[in-house]
Amino acid sequence: MIPEHSAHCHACKDRVRELLAATYGHCHVNHSFSWPARPEDYDHTALGAALRRISGGLGDLRGHRDFIKSALTPPCDFYVPHPPFILEFDECQHFSQARLTALSLYPSDVKLGFPLDRWRQLCRDIDARDDEPIDRDERRAWYDTLRDLVPALHGFEPTVRLYAEEFVWCSLDSATRRDQERFRAILIERLK
């Protein structure tokens, strides 16, 4: 039986967790890594210039330049250790003008676990605005950027992003092989 479904369906995110565990054996929820959150901490890495460019672009967007509040990257939605990758479950608030700005500044050769052009279009179509606090959109876009780009420095597969409303995730049954395979096919497509 499908639970009551809505745009902010908690059962959908729970089902994604169950499917990750069924597919990969284990997944961590709200997992934290000790990865720095400030662009200058990456100056001597392959991402240094890109992260400086993205943080600058976010600061220029609305003039909110002090949006990086945490010394470390906040927890990710899901972390699968084998093979190592992060999965983020993006609800509508992730598709903002700030996120579009960040995505537009990604290096052209970066490998992503989601369709970049589609995510950009979702940002244009949804145009979410969350001004509480005033720089919330910039913060969210920055931390999403770190979760997209930094894992590669640590040997991870690309971060997979699922749009919460692209599918009724709670309609899947994590106990059935058919739905496990259906979910796995989505992940494999994103990780190509």
Positions of predicted regions on the chain:
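Nucleic-acid endo/exonuclease domains
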Residues: 1-192
